[in-house]
Amino acid sequence: MSSKSDTPVASEDFNKVYNSSFAHWMWSDVRIPKELKDLVTINKPKTSLELGCGLGRFSSFMAEQGIKATGVDFSSVAIEKAKKRVVNAEHKPTFIVGDVTNLKMINEQFDISFDVGCFHCLNEQEQQKYVSEVYRLLKPGATHLIWAIDSSPSDIKLSPNYIAKVFANSFRLAKTEPSRRRIISSHWYWLVRAQ
């Protein structure tokens, strides 16, 4: 995925991170972003798909709202930990080990999808595959929400213009909002799937 040598890029790399104490520090922020709450309030989805779900806290939030939630991550360690986190939960999301650029094991279409920190790790070729998969897995007119770092680990400078261009054939960039999540310059992107 990424070209920076010190950045985790493969599922094995992320498995090591998720098995370390660093994972707790890096992904321990359990607050649900306002943007995700708004996604639910505005769209009133029955189904949701999270790409790069990690430990599954956002998919768990969706399930708690009564949404049939599915979370995907290529780290088997993250998915194992996500499943353990919800073992006693009343409403459980489905967690799947999978590559966000090739999700052939999923055949349903979702009312919404979202990605909080995955897209910015992909190279240009992977981004194109990602867009194709999100298009295939979302219902026409559905919203895909992305949070991405502006100076991404993949060395690609992300911006509203760049995101609009990458998604142009399948989605309309409906809204962007600058963010300082985790003290990092970033943006939220609301993309609407073509009919």
What are these regions (language model features)?
Residues 1-51, 55-105, 122-133, 137, ...:
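Class I (Rossmann-like) S-adenosyl-L-methionine-dependent methyltransferase catalytic domain
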Residues 112-125:
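A short SAM/SAH-binding and catalytic strip from SAM-dependent methyltransferases
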Residues 105-113:
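A short acidic, Gly/Pro-enriched loop at the edge of an enzyme's catalytic core
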